Amino acid sequence: MEYRKLKEIADISISNVDKKSSENEKPVRLCNFVDVYRNWAITENMTEQLMVATAKQNEIEKFALHKGDVCITKDSETKDDIGMSTYIADDIDDLVLGYHCARISPKKEVLSGKFLNAFLHTMFVRKFYELNASGSGQRYTLSLDAIGEIPVPVLPLEEQRKRAEVLSLIDRKIEVNKKINDNLAQSAMVA
């Protein structure tokens, strides 16, 4: 199996779009650190949950998120909790990536975003990013170089799609179970 560095098969950029709103900027939906950290995928049915903020036109052009992109958290208070990822499953109008995160746009002829997201959740990647995070004590970060150096298995696209679909299906079932558990917990508190 062939492995290639992520930076060879994807475009990577680190966002600096903050949560503040300014009158002279355009309204956007912000995909924040917490959105990336907590979700396997960002879908159009989550639009109402995303924060509304503003951004400059050049920030919108640079950090707009599109179907197939993958986002990761690049900062954390602990090394073992860095580089969490999410997949952008749908095109969502005015969706922009917030700060403390990096956008990874796979080269579609080589790499599936869904597959990349699943790969970024593996223990191999978790450990790689933990060992390559810089900082001390209270804040750790992944540099653009550290993010791009991860070796990614390059399988035929159809094989990537099959593997990603199985893992996405499992994740959807986990999400349903979480919602059921949350509802049961809320019901128990009311009773």
What are these regions (language model features)?
Residues 3, 30, 82, 113, ...:
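Alpha-helix initiation and N-capping motif
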Residues 5-22, 34-70, 76:
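Sequence-specific dsDNA recognition surfaces
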Residues 32-33, 53-55, 59-121:
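A short beta-sheet element
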